UniProtKB/Swiss-Prot annotation:
It comes from the Eukaryota. CDD domains: lectin_legume_LecRK_Arcelin_ConA (cd06899). SUPFAM superfamilies: Concanavalin A-like lectins/glucanases. One of its GO terms (molecular function) is carbohydrate binding. This is Lectin. Homodimer. Belongs to the leguminous lectin family. Glycans are attached at N17, N113. Binds one manganese ion and one calcium ion.
Length: 239
């Protein structure tokens, strides 16, 4: 069995195992800020940032056809200090081609460039979306499972607990092809789940990068924070 795992219980500035892109930075207090915070402490609009684990993950074996199961956990908070215009845009866990650069921000969350279904993206993502774009369901916020498109194949509304820490678990079971997502707010006790069948061998390249991305909106003050406090990932590919 080929395994890879990493675990950050907090983040250290200058960590060699993480590649920061766009606005993303790690604070002295150990928080990964995916989008920009202005000097006045308020979130900036028109900001996109991502972090990637520096080593690629072997998701499936092109010789034997075996597929990896994986589990990732992270905790984050989204704080929305403004009520007008509507806060935007969200945070996303994604897996896709190695050495990719940030895509469009705003509602595309730094992972996609348009709203088309395009298999060349070779990307699987789980979004925590706070703004309803034309391709989104009307309910916001929502969890979405994205396969080669920002148009989610399945969504689940959730109630944002403003500024509070959310814990996420995303599991993929290769034999059943089930991707299962759980979002928990310890502060309120709220639990949200969503699951869908995804054939990762048909979606992803055999080697992928895994990352987190966040984006704020295209209008002045259409902004919120996207802060990540911990992140772990493990994958195992059978022989």
């Amino acid at each position: 069995v080929e395994t890879i795992s990493f675990s950050f219980s907090e983040f250290e500035p200058g960590n060699d195992n993480l590649t920061l892109q766009g606005a993303a930075l790690i604070t002295q207090s150990g928080v990964l800020q995916l989008t920009k915070i202005n000097q006045n402490g308020m979130p900036a609009w028109d900001s996109t940032g991502r972090t990637l684990y520096t080593k690629p993950v072997h998701m499936w074996d092109s010789t034997t056809g075996t597929v990896a199961s994986f589990e990732t956990r992270f905790s984050f908070s989204i704080e929305q200090p403004y009520t007008r215009p509507l806060p935007a845009d969200g945070l996303v866990f994604f897996m896709g081609p190695t050495k990719s650069k940030p895509a469009q921000g705003y509602g595309y969350l730094g992972v996609f460039n348009n709203s088309k279904q395009d298999n060349s993206y070779q990307t699987l993502a789980v979004e925590f979306d706070t703004f309803s774009n034309p391709w989104d369901p009307p309910q916001v916020p929502h969890i979405g499972i994205d396969v080669n498109s920002i148009r989610s194949i399945k969504t689940q509304p959730f109630q944002l607990d403003n500024g509070q820490v959310a814990n996420v678990v995303i599991k993929y079971d290769a034999p059943s092809k089930i991707l299962h997502v759980v979002l928990v707010y310890p502060s309120s006790g709220a639990i949200y789940t969503i699951a869908e069948i995804v054939d990762v061998k048909q979606v992803l390249p055999d080697w992928v990068d895994v990352g987190l991305s966040g984006a704020t909106g295209a209008q002045r003050d259409a902004a919120e924070t996207h802060d990540v406090y911990s992140w772990s990932f493990q994958a195992s590919l059978p022989e």
